[in-house]
Amino acid sequence: MKLYFASGNDHKKTEMSRLLGGFELTLPKEEGIYFDPDENGETFIDNAVIKAKALYDIVHAPVLADDSGLCVDALGGKPGIHTARYGEEDAGRKLSAEEKYMLLLKNMEGITNRRAEFVCAICLYLSPTRIYVIQETSEGSIALTPSNGNGGFGYDPVFYNNEAGMIVAELPEGKKDLYSHRGKAARIMKTLIEKELNR
């Protein structure tokens, strides 16, 4: 089954393709589709549905969308739904992943409560009357310094996953999938997609 993936993020596509194994994911840009929806929801679920519906309205075919982010207790839940753009408004430009996680560490200097969680909402949009959403989390804390591990992407070098007992960037690829917010949500979604196909 071909699924459009409502994203422009190659890393996310690679990870989601692996997690869903057997389902071909197609990014809009791979078919020359301009896709830049206004993610103006208040929650991860809102934004996943907004992205899925926006792409469905263009392709009229099954769409998968994910919205995820990092919520840090001591920062009032920030960066939250703005994780991907963290610090960019103040900087007036796009920031690299390293610049974002270094900014996060700077903003947490002197803070002892380092509890945080990654949240992932995945929406499967089959039609305007068949929409499914799954949300999962992975709990942990923000490290004091970045790890030298080279696994993962984004904030993985500074996120300690409680279940895994280590920094996410240090986890082997298969292990990350076991503990990550996206891995948990994708496993449930994979089962749901398989059920839908057998209806």
Model-assigned labels for residue ranges:
Residues 2-4, 11-199:
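Anionic-ligand binding patches
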